[in-house]
Amino acid sequence: MTFQGAFTALVTPFKDGEIDQDAYRELIEWQIEQGIDGLVPCGTTGEAATMTHEEQGEVIRICVEQAKGRVPVIAGAGSNNTKEAVNLTKLAKQAGADATLQITPYYNKPTPAGLLAHFKALSEEASMPFILYNVPGRTGLNALPETIAMIANEVPDVVGVKEATANLGQVSDVIEQCPEGFTVLSGDDFTVLPLLALGGHGVISVVSNIVPDLMSGMCAAYRAGDMKKAQELHFKMQPLNRVMFVETNPIPVKTALGMMGKFETSFRLPLVPLMEASKAKLEAQLKASGLI
């Protein structure tokens, strides 16, 4: 299976502290109706760090069930504990996910040899396609292009990378050094179009939670050779991208979906509601963009 185009890093609706299954299914259905190319449950945006393993398995299962094979599902299943990552990956595999998103182990800052050993263990104990997730702003570790290329060459289950550095020089080096057919997805909504121009394949997106049609449309326009339309959609999304990060993700995007009437805005600690000043900025931009 190839992974290209716009994948939404899905938020997880909560109600009374529990997963709101009905709202989650409705969000997934709306995403598919709006033309999204794929779904990513249990990532950073999905507040997976606040869930039990059982809850993560449930969220992935619901996503796979609701998608019904219409779009691929890449399930977040990473950890800084290799054994835990193996167990989460097995849960995702049992739930029917097409691949998993594997964050580079955070906090303990493994060496390149440690990263390779981590992904080899994952492949040996829970074999399925993996997308490596490089997000140094959250992990404290930047997997350099030569490290990603080493892992890609030595661990065949690692089929791609979500590059969230927003460093186009680094993205270019990853594309240059990794094997042919290795998928490179943006983890930064601001630089999706230039990443595509370098030879990347798509994005795992935050803003597509609220505008799946625009993000998938931009990726499709680029693939069709319509650069003018792709540029128009890029600039149409940029103001929304800015307010999506006015505070820590996923607080703004989840608040936006609440303003759009998709579900009740609720977070699990340590995340708290958007500050009033930020909420005013978000509301103004959603109105300016015609979303509310």
Swiss-Prot record:
Residues that coordinate or bind pyruvate: T45, I204
Pathway(s) it belongs to: Amino-acid biosynthesis; L-lysine biosynthesis via DAP pathway; (S)-tetrahydrodipicolinate from L-aspartate: step 3/4
GO biological process: diaminopimelate biosynthetic process; lysine biosynthetic process via diaminopimelate
GO CC annotation terms, alphabetical: cytosol
Keywords recorded for this protein, A-Z: Amino-acid biosynthesis, Cytoplasm, Diaminopimelate biosynthesis, Lyase, Lysine biosynthesis, Schiff base
UniProt-annotated location(s): Cytoplasm
Gene: dapA
Keyword Amino-acid biosynthesis listed: yes
SMART domains per the UniProt record, alphabetical: DHDPS (SM01130)
UniProt-listed Enzyme Commission number(s): 4.3.3.7
NCBIfam families for the chain: dapA (TIGR00674)
Reaction(s) catalysed by this chain's protein: L-aspartate 4-semialdehyde + pyruvate = (2S,4S)-4-hydroxy-2,3,4,5-tetrahydrodipicolinate + H2O + H(+)
Predominant location: cytoplasm
Active site: Y133 (proton donor/acceptor), K162 (schiff-base intermediate with substrate)
Enzyme kind, highest EC tier: lyase
Site (Part of a proton relay during catalysis): T44, Y107
Subunit description: Homotetramer; dimer of dimers.
InterPro entries recorded: Aldolase_TIM, DapA, DapA-like, Schiff_base-form_aldolases_CS
Family per similarity comment: Belongs to the DapA family.
Protein name: 4-hydroxy-tetrahydrodipicolinate synthase
Function: Catalyzes the condensation of (S)-aspartate-beta-semialdehyde [(S)-ASA] and pyruvate to 4-hydroxy-tetrahydrodipicolinate (HTPA).
One GO MF term: 4-hydroxy-tetrahydrodipicolinate synthase activity
